[in-house]
Amino acid sequence: EIGSGLVGSEMCIRDSHNTLIIRWQRREKYRMLDKVIENNRVCIIGEIVSEFTFSHEVFGEGFYIANVSVNRLSDMVDVIPLMISERLIDVTKDYRGMKIEVAGQFRSYNRHEGTKNKLVLSIFVRELRFLEDDEMPEEQSKSNQIFLDGYVCKPPIYRKTPLGREIADILVAVNRPYGKSDYIPCIAWGRNARFAGGLEVGAHLQVSGRVQSREYTKKIGEEEVERRVAYEVSVSKIDLVEDEE
C-alpha cells in the first residue's frame, strides 16, 4: 500500500456548477506516482450502514471494511464496501446512519477460496469527511463518480438481454505503483456496449461512470443456489486512447 506521505492528498470538491470533482494536490517530486494514482479516481457520498470489520494489516497499519449506501437516480441504492485505514478514522466507533463523503481508488485483490480465486473489490479511501444532511447533493448523479484509465485485459463480452437491451462486459486493468494492477469489471450499455464489444485485448481506455452493486444467484450444487453481490463500474462514457509510439 502507498503511505500517505508519498503523494499529495485528494478530496471531493464542487466546482462553480456544483459538480463533484476530485482535486489532486501534487508534490513536484512525486509527479510520476501521482500520474499513476490519477488513473483511478472515485468519489462517493452516502450513508454508513455497517460497523467496521478487520480486513488485513500492512507494516503494522490495520485496514478495515465498512459499507456505505449510495442512492441512485432511481429508488434503488448501491451498497459499496470501503477499505479504510485505522489512521484515518476511529474504527472502534459505530458510525451507522452518518453521512460521509470519500475520495480514493477502486481496487481489487484475489482472495483464495479453496482451489479458486475470487476477485474482491472495494473503494480504498484516501480522504473522508462527515456531512450534515444539508450538505448532501440534490442531484444523485453527483454522489457517485469514478474515472479509470487502463487497458482491456480480456476479450469484451457483448450480448443482448431478452428485452433487446445491449450490454458489454469489460475487464479493465488499471496500473498501480510498485508494479501492481487493479482489475475492474465494467459494464457498458447501448452504443457504448456496441463500441466496447469491438475492442481488442490491450486497448487503452478511459472510462467514466459510477460504482454499482448488483445481486445475482449462483448455483453451487444440484439444488442449492447462493445469493451473491458483484461490484462493478456502470459506464456512462468510454474513450479509446491512442498511445504515442
Residue ranges and their predicted role:
Residues 1-16:
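Single conserved hydrophobic/aromatic residue that forms the stacking wall/gate
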Residues 20-245:
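Single-stranded nucleic acid-binding surfaces, predominantly the OB-fold ssDNA-binding core
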